[in-house]
């Protein structure tokens, strides 16, 4: 019985750790969203225009952070801590759960020196390329709703914001 009780206690402890991590991720996502500026920003408008996208009206689900921090976990010999590698412009999109409520964020770091391009970053320890798009919060089963017109009879879905927006804007 002692082994089973220990295993159950460990499973409960792990579940509590995971629940705290999920709650922290949701809080982080809300803070990121709240800190981002609503409405179009010239850097974001230029990025999207270089990709052939012009929103009218501007989606409420898209915001801009001029100095979004990009954090990486450093190698153990460097302390193993999270460190800000880059702070720069990012498109911030709200992710909504199936219930329509905010559940997370999707960020795309933009390279203003290269129109229409995402920021290129490499991990300082390994040199590996890093993703220019990151999410935070509860993303599974969620969607970034660019528009929600009343009485719509067609739904456009896609893998990425820019890809989906291209299909939506083209009609």
Task: Identify the meaning behind each predicted range.
Residues 70-171:
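Phosphate-handling DNA/RNA-contact segment within nucleic-acid enzymes
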Residues 2-91, 96-99, 149:
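TOPRIM metal-binding catalytic domain and adjacent DNA-binding surface shared by DnaG-type primases
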């Amino acid at each position: 019985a002692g082994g089973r009780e220990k295993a159950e206690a460990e499973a409960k402890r792990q579940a509590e750790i995971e629940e705290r991590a999920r709650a922290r991720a949701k809080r982080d996502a809300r803070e990121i969203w709240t800190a981002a500026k609503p409405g179009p920003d010239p850097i974001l408008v230029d990025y999207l225009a270089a990709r052939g996208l012009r929103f009218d009206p501007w989606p409420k689900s898209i915001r801009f952070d001029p100095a979004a921090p990009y954090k990486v976990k450093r190698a153990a010999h460097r302390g193993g801590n999270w460190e800000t590698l880059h702070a720069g412009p990012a498109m911030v999109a709200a992710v909504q759960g199936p219930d329509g409520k905010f559940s997370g964020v999707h960020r795309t770091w933009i390279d203003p020196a290269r129109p229409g391009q995402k920021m290129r970053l490499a991990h300082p320890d390994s040199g590996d390329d890093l993703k220019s798009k990151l999410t935070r919060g509860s993303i599974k089963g969620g969607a970034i709703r660019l528009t929600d017109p009343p009485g719509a009879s067609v739904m456009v879905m896609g893998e990425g914001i820019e890809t989906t927006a291209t299909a939506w804007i083209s009609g």
